[in-house]
Each structure stands twice: as C-alpha cells, then as structure tokens.
Regions:
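Positively charged, helix-rich recognition surfaces that bind polyanionic ligands
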Residues: 3, 233-491
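Generic detection of short hydrophobic beta-strand segments and adjacent strand-loop junctions
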Residues: 8-14, 196-202, 274-277
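Short amphipathic alpha-helical segments
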Residues: 23, 27-30, 129-133, 349, ...
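Long, hydrophobic, amphipathic alpha-helical segments used as structural scaffolds
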Residues: 39-46, 141-152, 368, 420-423
C-alpha cells in the first residue's frame, strides 16, 4: 500500500488552442469508455459470485452472527465469540472476491490487457492512467459489494457528462508539469494525449498560489478538468502538491467548543460566543427558481418523447429517451449554473467560518454528529392522531443538502491539522451536553423544539446550542470540569 502524505491542490485556468481541445475531448470520451468497460466487467463478476451457493451461505451466517451480537449487546453480555465468527466470515468473503477478480489489482490487469490489444483506442493512455481509472471503478464497485447500492443503480458515464477529468499517478511520465527556463513562463505542461507542451505563464498564478508552489515539497501529479460554465467548456489544471500550504491565518490561544447542527453551528471560545447559519442567503428564492426549471425540463422531455410515457403520465418500463433538445440543454445549463453558484457561496461561507474559529483556538472540541444517519428515512411508522394518516418518513435530507455540515467538519479538521491544532471529538452519548445543567449538576432531557430554556431562577433564557458549545469546551477526558465551568460562566 502506498504511503499517504498530506497534500493540497492549486487550480489554474488553461487557455488551449482549438486543436489541443479537440484531442482532449477525444481522450475524455475514451476515458469514459475505459471506466464503463471496467464497471461492466465488475458487475458481471459480481452477478456470477452472487449465484455461488458458498457465497450465499457465508452472507447468511454473517448476518446471523451480526444479529446475535446486537442481541447480546442489548442484554449487556459478552460478544467475543460472535465477533471472531464475523471476522472469519469477512476473511472468507475477501478470499472469494479475490477468486472472482473483484479487486483493484484484477481490474488493473483486465483493463491493461484491453489496452494492449492491437488497434485499441485505449493505447493513448499509459499504465498509470489506466491504474487511476481502475481505482475509480473499484470505489464504485465497493458500494455494490457491501450492499450500499443495488447493481442496477450503478451509473455509467455518458458522453453528455459536462464535468470530466483525467490524471496520472505520478508527475514523471505521461501528462506532467515541468519547470520552464523561459523568463515569463513558470511551467510547461506536457499533455500526453496531444503529444505537445503548453506554456503556463507566471501571471496565471496569483501571489498566494506562487507562494504555495514554493512551499511544496514536490508535485505529486497533475489533473486536467473540463467544466461547463454558462454553456461553455472551460479547462482547468489542478496541481496536487505534497506538504501543507501557507496559512492565511494564525492559530489562537484557548479551547473552542463547537456544537454542530444541521443548518447551524454554535461555537464558544474565551473571546467570542456565536451561533452561525450555514445556509447561503436568498436560498428560498433560488430553490423556487430551481423547481420551476425542473418542471420546464420535464415538460420539454415529455413533449419530445411522447412514446416513452403511458396514458396516466408514468414512464414506460425500458423507455429510451431521445437526445435532449436545444431548449432542454439550455435549461439544464441554467440549472447547473444555479447549483454551481450555490455551492461556491456555501464553500466561501464555510471557509470564512473555519478561519474565524481557528484564529481563536489552540484546542478544538467538537461534538460528534452522524450526518449519514440523519439523512436516512425513518424506520418508525407514526400516525397523526388528527388525520389518522402516517407521518412522512423523511428526515433532514433537504436541510443537509442546503447546508453541507459534513463539508464544514472536513474543512475544519484539514485547517486545524495544517496549523497544528488538536481536534477532539466528544461523544454525545457519554456526556450529553444538550441535557446537562452545570448549576444543579443534573441531566434534564428536553424536546428538540426547545431552543431556549432556564437553567435556574437566576439564569433564564439560555440558548440551547450556545450553552452546549460552552459545555463542550469544558470537557476533559469524558468529564465536565466543574470548577472551570463555574468560573467561566458569565454572571
């Protein structure tokens, strides 16, 4: 297994001649074909493995062992024997997957054999680029192997995909970046698919990017990305450097407690206490506009493909839609532009918030929040007593899509590691910060709708999230620092 080292990315816009763009477009199409062939090969091997009785027996035995572990945990009994059984089943399943060629190495081997065939269009890719595509294929197949998605839900790449990319494993062969001897030229990009060099001038990099390049230990590899912005194709070069980039902020002094929510985040430091909204401004108006665009796109599709729909308006099974019309493509581009602007605004807000937090912290304590669990549908069926109908099983999927709380957590941990700030994840099950009252030293369970409550007759109107963030900042080794809490709590 390759050693994992810290890295960061520098993006530069490329200005390419039309001839090179055409060659890149051809390479993107062939890259999609390689990926699709790998997916097709993997799904066929998976279906063959599913028909094996030994595989079915292993899955059944593992499922029973896992159910037994859950029962023993509820009864607070030892689970050592069953845990060993699960490990043995996992080992046997791994060997079976190897026997059926469902490993990254076997995928690399298969795609390399296809590349070496006489007249194969895959020959313009070197071995490193084929290995990268095989790794991407394996990531998708792992979701099928571990039953996170069903095989028919796997998405094949299309020639209509707007954002595509390819990269190499190293910066020594194939598509690579080399330093230039010319005065105003910073680097020379060798594009393997076009067999030509492209000069990248110094002015293409801003001051911070130039500083970041000098900080890098080495360039790991480069990646060429094609994005569609306002209906036009734009090419970017991503330079992946080893090491840490220069920081624009310096770390502070003190402990910062963070209580992350779905749409908001509360933090408490020695100098500031704040509750910040993660949702971009004017999102309600933009969402209404997106719904209108969705309806227009569907109407256009129905008009152009009437044979694909039944009389009641539902889609026929196995229906094949025609190529989208110009109007439909125009509407899709408008919708894509709106999603891109929302994403950029959200990323900008989160970056500003991360800088604001780390500039006040030498230690960060954050409550662990399982976002993956919150976006799933509820299993319980609850009946509304007024209408006698079941409540919706939907939970927080839309709110998570709006605010992207996991992206904030990743950005915070990345920035903290760059500045040498310790990040401690606090388990909410152990310390229960939303229930604890440091004045009475008791735990009082509250409903989710209760956002403001009274600690005592003296301390009234305490905001729940801010108080939880304050408590999280005063937890050490799974216990509340009672003396420090009494001392730091404002009068």
């Amino acid at each position: 297994m390759r050693a994992q080292t810290p890295s960061y990315v520098i993006s530069v816009k490329l200005h390419l001649p039309k001839q090179i763009e055409n060659r890149l477009e051809k390479s993107f199409r062939i890259s999609n074909s390689v990926y699709n062939e790998g997916i097709s090969f993997g799904l066929k091997r998976f279906e063959a493995m599913k028909r094996n009785p030994y595989y079915q027996e292993l899955l059944k035995a593992r499922r029973l062992a896992k159910a037994g572990i859950d029962k023993l945990k509820k009864a607070k009994k030892k689970t050592k024997g069953l845990v060993q059984q699960v490990k043995l089943h996992d080992k046997a399943l791994l060997e079976l997957r190897k026997a059926y060629g469902l490993t990254e190495f076997e995928l690399q081997k298969y795609l390399s054999q296809q590349r070496r065939k006489t007249g194969s269009p895959y020959q313009q890719f070197n071995a490193g680029e084929i290995q990268v595509i095989a790794g991407q294929v394996m990531k998708t197949l792992e979701k099928v192997l571990f039953y996170q998605i069903k095989p028919h839900k796997v998405r094949f790449r299309s020639k209509f995909d707007l954002d595509v990319s390819f990269r190499n494993r190293v910066n020594t062969t194939g598509t690579r970046l080399e330093p230039s001897d010319k005065k105003d030229i910073a680097y020379r990009l060798y594009i393997h698919k076009a067999s030509t060099f492209v000069d990248i001038p110094v002015k293409a990099f801003n001051k911070y990017q130039q500083m970041s390049l000098t900080y890098s230990e080495k360039i790991k590899y480069v990646q060429i990305i094609r994005k569609t912005i306002r209906g036009k194709k734009v090419y970017y070069l991503q330079i992946v450097c080893q090491g840490f980039p220069p920081s624009k902020v310096t770390k502070g002094q003190g402990v910062v407690g963070i209580d992350p929510g779905i749409s908001t985040v509360a933090f408490a430091s020695p100098t500031e206490v704040a509750l910040v909204d993660l949702v971009p401004k004017n999102i309600t108006q933009k969402e209404k506009h997106l719904k209108r665009l969705d309806r227009k796109i569907e109407q256009s599709q129905r008009v152009n493909n009437p044979e694909c729909y039944k009389e009641n308006g539902t889609i026929k099974k196995g229906a094949r839609f025609k190529r989208p019309s110009k109007r439909q493509m125009h509407l899709r581009n408008r919708r894509r532009k709106m999603y891109r602007s929302l994403s950029e605004e959200r990323t900008k807000l989160q970056g500003q918030l991360v800088n604001r937090i780390v500039s006040q912290a030498s230690v960060i304590r954050v409550e662990g929040l399982n976002i993956k669990g919150l976006q799933k549908r509820s299993r319980d069926i609850r009946i509304n007593p007024k209408t006698n109908r079941p409540y919706s099983k939907k939970r927080y999927g839309k709110a998570i899509f709006r605010a992207a709380p996991s992206a904030l957590r990743v950005a915070l941990e990345t920035r903290a590691s760059q500045l040498g700030i310790d990040v401690e994840v606090i388990s909410p099950k152990e310390v229960k910060p939303s229930q604890y009252n440091h004045i009475t030293q008791t735990f009082d369970k509250k409903s989710l709708s209760t956002r403001v409550y009274d600690l005592s007759d003296e301390y009234t109107g305490v905001q729940r999230d801010l108080y939880s963030a304050f408590l999280i900042g005063h937890i050490e080794k799974g216990r509340y620092q009672q003396e420090q809490l009494n001392q730091d709590f404002p009068d």
